[in-house]
Amino acid sequence: MDREYVARIEHGLRVIVTAGAAGIGRVIVEALHTCGAYIHVCDVDADAVADLNSALPEVGTTIADVSDASQVDQFFAEAETHLGGLDVLVNNAGIAGPTASIDAISPEDWERTVAVNLNGHFYCARRATPLLRNSENAVMINLSSVAGRLGFQYRTPYAATKWGIIGFTQSLAKELGPEGIRVNAILPGMVEGPRIERVISARAKTMGQSEAEVKTEMLSNVSLRRTVAPNDIAEMVLFLCSSGARNISGQSLSVCGNVETM
């Protein structure tokens, strides 16, 4: 972790992170916790939540599915009680969705991907905004993807929702900017971890290739020829929460090694 960023994060920042018990979300939570932030997270994985409770008992947790507006309402009620307010929302929850040609994607898979990736951002943003209005350092960070600017063959539901998050971010930046609320999107590339391995496996099956061939092909489209570490995403979150980003809003910031095509 870059100590320069840590030094510029306000101690005691009140943060909500969705899907914060595992994966990228967990790394973001750990980075913010190191900075002295007060954090409340939601996740659908009860085992991951239990592990987070054991490792970081100071972090508040709620088991909730962001695709369900009523569960989001309960989550925010618990988070507000725990934190006493809100300075930062990290809209991290998302799913990979199906890997298939458009005519092989079921309406149910399409709707589930939209429900989690896009509706979930909306449900959380609408609950966070009244709280952020009372913050002197109000920040909303939405997790999109490089697929949200390039498209992604055989991953149409995922790419469509991630494009949607970019439009969602830019619209809210204009709407909420006059109230001092900064809104940005982070666009990760190939982030190391179980999710990208599942994506590679599904793509290999769809394309009739080996997983090694798919990974090599995907990395050949990255200028730096390497994957992204979850901590790289956490570093960007820290920066966007810092005073150094006080005039950054409405931006879609890629952390991807320069993905040229997908």
Regions found by a protein language model. Name each.
Residues 100-102, 106-114, 218:
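Substrate-binding pocket helix/loop in short-chain dehydrogenase/reductase
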Residues 145:
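Residue(s) in the substrate-gating loop at a strand-loop-helix junction
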Residues 177, 182, 248-250:
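Short, small/polar-rich loop/turn modules that mediate ligand/substrate recognition or access, typified
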Residues 185, 209-244, 248, 255-257:
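C-terminal helical subdomain
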